[in-house]
Amino acid sequence: VVADNPQLIDINMISNGPGGGGGGPGGGGGDWFHVNGVAYNEDLDQIAFSSRFASEIYIIDHSTTTAEAASHSGGNSGMGGDILYRWGNPSNYNMSGNQTIPSAVHDVRWIKDDGRPNGGFLQIFNNKGVSNNQSTVDGIDAPIDPNNPYNYYRAVGQPFGPSSFTTRYVCAYSAPGQSASDRMYNGNIFVNASGGQGGAGVMYEVDQNGTIVWGPYNADTQKAFRYECEHPGIVSLQPFMNSTATTSCFS
């Protein structure tokens, strides 16, 4: 029974995905799942990934051995290669509940838990979070299992929580596909609304009030990243900067 096993993927859950085929791998619908974002959490030793066609995000255990990953036990979570957490579309495992990711989703990542606002939350670019023409950047506070800090709580017979996003920024510029976002140490949100598939094609940064404080700059990119000034790679560039050049880091 699919609903009794949300820790597993139902290969028939995407019956007619945009990848061009009716569920399951291979054939004309070989891109039936379309994973487009992967993030690693070193503290938890876990991996998160997002599926564009499933309209869902997932977490799996990275601490397992190869043998454990092929089973249902082992690793820090004790669940082997099973799905530890999933969010966005409970109908994928035959449960009722809010479909919080109505269509495409991209660039799942953990917000760094280093003192910045909402540290430890998952963050996604929800391409059609409000409507077909309105994207959002959503934060999700995944509920930790009180009996195992490497697992996630789910009430029996209920979908994984929370029932809705924990935080949301409604994008000033939207994109129906691709795209990325990140949370800066000061709480600002970096947004890259991709130019592909008719998107805005800009990148910009907003403060915690939603006011644009950097950009928007034209950027016909699929996914962009904003590195903070303290990043070791940025710091190492300082000796090589032209003395007449100015940047937001070396002004």
Residue ranges, per PLM feature:
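Histidine-/acidic-rich catalytic cores in large beta-rich domains
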Residues: 1-251
